[in-house]
């Protein structure tokens, strides 16, 4: 029977919006890889309690506020991991490697330069998404949608999800191509629709 492990992890940002990473010791499972700080839940602990304990033990910080970011299920050859990931909103203390591990503040755009355990890769993508993004409303015409997206980008939108079930496949495809050009270098475009259609943008 596959072993199951419940783990918590934290995305912690400093004032410069850099994200804290910790290097797994070489003598541990998946040693030498970078990870988001955290650890295993102990019996009777809630994920938030485990997170608070682990961050105090590992980093010497006390968290005051956090919110769920993502939950990840991942199967390794020898273990199934359930990973509850939280974004830490407020904490006290100066984060350091309290257990002797190397820690580093990393720019969000530089996360791709680091090697992570497979279960952490989904966290990397979630951490890089803007905290707020625009989802297009239904029941608008193509030109209304385009104008609204244009306005959202001018207002600083960094992630735009094109959700338009009212459009035909051809209308959606044409609009997506126009928005892809509009968003280039300014924002991420997320498409939501028929899988066969989305494959054309892969």
Report each predicted region and the residues it spans.
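A short coil-to-beta-strand element that immediately follows conserved catalytic motifs
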Residues: 61-71, 87
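Conserved N-terminal beta-strand and adjoining loop/helix that marks the start
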Residues: 1-20, 71
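Cofactor-binding loop segments of dinucleotide-utilizing enzymes, especially the Rossmann-like FAD-
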Residues: 15, 24, 137
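Conserved Nudix-box catalytic region and its N-terminal flanking loop in Nudix hydrolases
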Residues: 18-58, 69-70, 188-190
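Active-site-adjacent beta-strand/loop module that shapes the phosphate/pyrophosphate-binding cleft
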Residues: 14, 72-94
């Amino acid at each position: 029977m596959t072993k199951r492990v419940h783990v918590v992890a934290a995305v912690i940002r400093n004032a410069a919006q850099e994200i804290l990473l910790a290097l797994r010791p070489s003598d541990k499972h998946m040693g030498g890889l970078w990870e988001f700080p955290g650890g295993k839940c102990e019996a009777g602990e809630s994920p938030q309690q485990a997170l608070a304990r682990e961050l105090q033990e590992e980093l010497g910080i006390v968290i005051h506020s956090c919110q769920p970011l993502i939950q990840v299920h991942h199967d390794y050859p020898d273990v199934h991991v359930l990973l509850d990931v939280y974004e830490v909103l407020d904490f006290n203390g100066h984060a350091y490697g309290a257990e002797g591990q190397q820690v580093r503040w990393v720019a969000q755009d530089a996360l791709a330069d680091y090697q992570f355990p497979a279960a952490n890769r989904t966290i990397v993508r979630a951490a890089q998404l803007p905290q707020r993004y625009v989802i297009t409303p239904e029941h608008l015409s193509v030109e209304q949608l385009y104008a609204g997206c244009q306005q959202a980008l001018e207002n600083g939108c960094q992630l735009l999800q094109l959700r338009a079930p009212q459009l035909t496949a051809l209308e959606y495809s044409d609009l997506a191509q126009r928005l892809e050009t509009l968003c280039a270098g300014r924002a991420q475009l997320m498409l939501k629709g028929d899988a066969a259609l989305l494959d054309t943008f892969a």
